[in-house]
Amino acid sequence: AGEYSLSQITMDDVDLTRKLKDTKLRVKAYYAYDSVSQCVLGASYSRDKDQNLVKECFRDMFRLIAKHGWGIPAGIEVENHLMSEYKYTLLQEGTVFSYVRYCAPLNSQEKQAENINGAKKRRIIHRNHVGIGRFYGKWKYRVESKKISDAGNDTWEDKQYYSFDELVADDRRDNYEWN
């Protein structure tokens, strides 16, 4: 982690907690956080976890940095699986960032962004939206849902579903409140 704000950023993907009306799936989000202040510097949203999601997050972050006239952070911490395409371009040390740290594959807890995602969920998202949690959760993190018997045996029916635009707008408001 850096010592000063905007000295290092950390990036991670997350599935939004509520589901879409049309597909009953979750919207994928990608965030860029400042490691020191933990502010969201960039966010992007998609129905699929792919390279466009990553590129749009970088664009959103760089637009914010340029808009305010801030300098480019010295370091970045990223995961392997979605960032390997940029290893010899954008994420080559010295190209944009002085220091690039790739976290170990299959070790998601290593990234600082994972902890920030969890803190934001506990402090903001649970408070702002009803019905968020797991059927096996404890206390306020437990939700009631209806089990659907099917071939996969892992389907649960939620009480309410949302449009893509509603979910993105709600998440952007949550990010604004988090910052």
Q: What annotation goes with each model-predicted range?
A:
Residues 45-50:
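A short acidic/small-residue loop/turn micro-motif
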Residues 27-30, 42-43, 55-63, 77, ...:
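Short, well-ordered alpha-helical packing segments
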Residues 70-74, 80-179:
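Globin-like tetrapyrrole-binding proteins
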Residues 51-52, 110:
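Loop/helix-junction capping segments adjacent to catalytic residues or to phosphate/diphosphate-binding pockets
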Residues 11-13, 44, 77-80, 103:
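Short His-Asn-centered micro-motif
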Residues 1-31, 39, 52-57, 63-64, ...:
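Mobile-element integrase/transposase regions
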